[in-house]
Amino acid sequence: HKPLQDESGALSLPGVPIVHPGIGGYPFDGICGAVVAWKLAWMCARLAAGDEHGRLPSHLRSLLADLTSLAAIGTIADVVPLEEENRMIAAWGLRHIAQCRIPGVEALLRVANLDNKRQLTAMEVGFRLGPRLNAVGRLGKADAAVELLCTSDRNRAESLAVALDEVNRERQELTKRMAQEAEAMALANGFDQDDRR
């Protein structure tokens, strides 16, 4: 969902094939990268199935249902507006996450203490799953989140989810310390006085 423009504002495309909702007349350009990837996977599955009516074999339907959970997590964690396609994908994905068979999603639900829920809310995804996935990226270790969501090894998924949980706790502590330091600096400089606010 990043604009493809140069410094002057003109459309600037790389010399490689791209899939981007902001070009080619797509009706809604507010989708996040996770939804772009999901839609690309859906189209590839339809082409691979070779059915002109878009019917998919059950194994591809099951896979795409699981991938919709990832698209929903990405939509909510990326904080794109929950309107139009985003709302539909988030709603469907939220209903499906608890049944998702992706080992990394199952492990992430366990470390977030959400594995016993029948249906998650956007708040739970946004404040309990998203931060665990995003924290590693903020601290320069995004590969761990990608591996978590891509691995088929349940033991590896579990250890990665635990590691992401630990990094998220570290990020929370760092944020808390920084807020305390900022508050102390503000107080030391008299910004608690009415005339300095």
Model-derived features: where do they sit?
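Low-complexity, flexible helical/coil segments
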Residues: S8-G9, G33-K39, L108-R110, V167
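Fold-independent oxyanion-binding glycine-rich loops
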Residues: H1-K2, P21-I23, L40, I73, ...
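Hydrophobic, small-residue-rich alpha-helical packing segments that form membrane-like cores
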Residues: K2-V36, R46-A49, L56-D66
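Hydrophobic helix-and-loop "lid/oligomerization" segment in the mid-to-C-terminal part
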Residues: P14, R46-R197
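Catalytic-loop motifs flanking and including active-site residues across diverse enzymes
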Residues: C32-L40, S69, V125
